[in-house]
Amino acid sequence: MVTDLGGGYAEAEGGPVRHIPVLLEPVIEALEPSAGKVILDGTFGAGGYTSAILDTGADVIALDRDPNAIAGGQAMVAARAGRLTLHHTRFSTLDNFAPEGGLDGIVLDIGVSSMQIDEAERGFSFQRNGPLDMRMSGTGVSAADVVNRAKVGDLIRIFGFLGEEKQSGRIARAIEKRRVNHPFQTTRDLAGMIEIVTPRKAKDKIHPATRVFQALRVFVNDELGELAEALFAAERALKPGGRLVVVTFHSLEDRIVKKFFSDRSGKAAGSRHMPMAFERPATFEPVGKGMVTATEEEAEINPRARSAKLRAGIRTAHPAMKADFSIFDLPDLAEIERLGA
């Protein structure tokens, strides 16, 4: 059985499956990189997209919040003779790295990277025992902090919304009971307890801990907030005609990207904050016919591609709009995040 972990990476029960860039051909087709263009890769990871973009003759500005990714990318920086610059930062800050006149393209591959999964000490995998960490940057609140300190109601919200876990209440209450005398310290420790509380059924395609681990990772790294901020930053950073390409791996991420492009299309749909739909100048036009998914051939070769979705837009000449996070209808998790203060 293969568990999709996002970010173009999957995990089999017998061990890890190596990284292969997901939807690589559609990404390059949507970006249209070429000599003389400057493309920003906001999620460098193992450098799969960056390498392919450089091969077209375009120059690349690459970002990653993981210091290990930055260290691992130095050989590529040296080999590409001044055509690649690599920065240790969150991709939500990408507009700080745009050259005068703007970027020709931006690609974001949302999710955990292969290197992060490979390293047991990072705590992303329940198949590889290690500290319950999950911090991409190595700083801030860890998954263990959340599991051992958050209120049970907050755990229910985290697991239910960010992991779409139907058994969030049962799991959260079991965590609360167990951590009083035995705080959770390792990935296998938490995964084992979840498997006892919600045992796997014959029809289940994923491990019982998959959604909880996803929720913790997304929460610890503020992945949805980072994505939302990055989309607004991309709107500011792209030149007219520049292209934004985003690859997501679960419905929460895809929903944010879809809502952003819809809102910026000039025909914004109504929301609970502004029920009436309205028209305004568009800042993005669609690329192609809409969402792109993996072909049957790619999904057969690379099982992790099955859940990948690509959405892309072309920047118009209209000025960037105000960053209005209400368009995403995200829950307010700020109170929970204070446990890191």
Curated annotation (Swiss-Prot):
GO biological process per UniProt: rRNA base methylation
Origin: domain of life: Bacteria
InterPro entries named in the record: RsmH, SAM-dep_MeTrfase_MraW_recog, SAM-dependent_MTases_sf
The keyword Transferase is assigned to this record: yes
Binding positions (S-adenosyl-L-methionine): G47, G48, Y49, D64, F97, D109, Q116
Pfam families in alphabetical order: Methyltransf_5
Keywords: Cytoplasm, Methyltransferase, rRNA processing, S-adenosyl-L-methionine, Transferase
GO cellular component, one term: cytoplasm
Function: Specifically methylates the N4 position of cytidine in position 1402 (C1402) of 16S rRNA.
The protein's name in its UniProt record: Ribosomal RNA small subunit methyltransferase H
Lineage: Bacteria, Pseudomonadati, Pseudomonadota, Alphaproteobacteria, Hyphomicrobiales
